[in-house]
Design a protein with these regions (language model features):
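A short helix->loop->beta-strand "cap" motif at the edges of active sites that frequently abuts
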Residues: 35-40, 79-80
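NAD(P)H-binding glycine-rich loop region in Rossmannoid oxidoreductase-like domains
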Residues: 1-24, 52-53
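Active-site Tyr-X1-5-Lys
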Residues: 28-31, 58-83
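Conserved beta-loop-beta element that borders a ligand/cofactor-binding pocket
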Residues: 45, 71-97
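Mid/C-terminal beta-alpha module of Rossmann-like enzyme folds, strongest
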Residues: 124, 130-194, 207-230
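A conserved pocket-lining segment of Rossmann-fold NAD(P)-dependent short-chain dehydrogenase/reductase
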Residues: 106-128
Length: 230
């Protein structure tokens, strides 16, 4: 779970919520799979414990995902092979499945959300496609190294470069101003490495896990076309 699932009514703290649904529930699921006879498994995690380890113990979400990742990989044994794939920001398209955030990005880049300010936040990050994640997951299930945390990724972009790809794909090219303001679609509350942070790295195990790279621009073009026609 992430910030989207945290109750906003004050009924539970983020720390307690993440502890229950991540730290406790996810390892319990993998333990049940192991007891049921599953011999190989892959945990889909987040890149923050590896690229923003300074946030462990400081940010409840990053702390929780780190705890969960370590607990799952600790189950590795001669009879149970388990590794984790730690992902950056993921994008992809499944026909018939609408993602509100993607729909909002398309509308924003198309100029349909004229009430929102047009700019880019500071910093940037790595992105990967859901297709590449599927390829890596299949490979990891087949021959992933037990107990290993793989840091996956495709391309590094500043938020300015990334958003300008959306505007270009929407037929509304822009040279975006970079501001320190909270962005309406990429707010600081989801920037778990820290507001304005730049997360840039060379992905691991690209050949070992045989996943495609340099797919971001083409995927954005596909998404804009699909959502514009919906």
């Amino acid at each position: 779970a992430d910030i989207r699932q945290v109750p906003m009514d004050g009924s539970v703290t983020p720390e307690d919520f993440y502890r229950k649904v991540n730290d406790e529930a996810v390892p319990r699921f993998f333990a049940a799979a192991r007891e049921a006879g599953v011999r190989r498994a892959v945990y889909i995690g987040t890149f923050y414990p590896q690229v923003a380890s300074h946030r462990i113990g400081e940010c409840p979400y990053v702390t929780s995902r780190s705890n969960t990742d370590e607990a799952v990989r600790a189950m590795s044994s001669d009879s149970f092979t388990v590794c984790s794939l730690n992902l950056p920001f993921v994008m992809g398209h499944i026909p018939g499945l609408d993602i509100p955030h993607i729909g909002a990005l398309v509308a924003y880049a198309s100029g349909a959300l004229s009430e929102l300010p047009v700019f880019a936040p500071k910093g940037g990050t790595n992105h990967i496609t859901s297709h590449a994640v599927a390829q890596a997951t299949l490979a990891a299930l087949d021959h992933g190294e037990s107990g290993r945390a793989y840091l996956l990724g495709d391309e590094n972009y500043s938020w300015k470069e990334y958003l300008e790809l959306w505007f270009e794909a929407a037929g509304n090219p822009q040279t975006l101003e970079v501001r320190e303001d909270d962005h309406p679609l990429l707010p600081n509350v989801i920037m778990f490495a820290g507001p304005g942070a730049t997360v840039s790295y060379k992905p691991e195990a690209v050949e070992e896990l045989a996943y495609d790279r340099h797919q971001i621009k083409a995927t954005i073009n596909t998404l804009v076309k699909a959502y514009s026609e919906a």
